[in-house]
UniProtKB/Swiss-Prot annotation:
Disulfide bonds: none annotated. The keyword Kinase does not apply. This is Large ribosomal subunit protein uL14. One of its GO terms (biological process) is translation. It comes from Synechococcus sp. (strain CC9605). GO terms for molecular function: large ribosomal subunit rRNA binding; structural constituent of ribosome. Keywords: Ribonucleoprotein, Ribosomal protein, RNA-binding, rRNA-binding. The gene is rplN. The keyword rRNA-binding applies. It comes from the Bacteria. Binds to 23S rRNA. Forms part of two intersubunit bridges in the 70S ribosome. Belongs to the universal ribosomal protein uL14 family. GO terms for cellular component: cytosolic large ribosomal subunit. Part of the 50S ribosomal subunit. Forms a cluster with proteins L3 and L19. In the 70S ribosome, L14 and L19 interact and together make contacts with the 16S rRNA in bridges B5 and B8.
Length: 121
């Protein structure tokens, strides 16, 4: 579960390395899970890349440490909290996605992120 002021690692090559959640998008939502869109501030970034430190960006959560239950009865969790930076059209800013992503992204119409990911769990 991601909430305000949570830190996430960035799982793409947009230039940001760590982001901090400012707001979970939705009507009066407190927590974000896999597939939810958040507004975040870039806290650590690589030089001469697409995003800079202190930029405000939108990102979609692709991995969480919190255990997630699926409708089939399986439960899944990851080793870190990670997000992919997106633009207003829900397309990723980077051209690569690092690490596994959850299958729930396909159901939320983030098919471009799923196709770039090396592994879908």
């Amino acid at each position: 579960m991601i909430q305000q002021e949570s830190y996430l690692t960035v799982a793409d090559n947009s230039g940001a390395k760590r982001i901090q959640c400012i707001r979970v998008l939705g009507t009066n939502r407190r927590y974000a899970h896999v597939g939810d869109v958040i507004v975040a501030a870039v806290k650590d970034a690589a030089p001469n890349m697409g995003v800079k430190k202190s930029d405000v960006v939108k990102a979609v959560v692709v991995r969480t440490k919190a255990t997630m239950r699926r409708e089939t009865g399986n439960s899944i969790r990851f080793d870190d909290n990670a997000a992919v930076i997106i633009n207003d059209d829900k397309n990723p800013k980077g051209t690569r996605v690092f690490g596994p992503v959850a299958r729930e992204l396909r159901e939320r119409s983030f098919t471009k992120i799923v196709s770039l990911a090396p592994e879908v769990i």
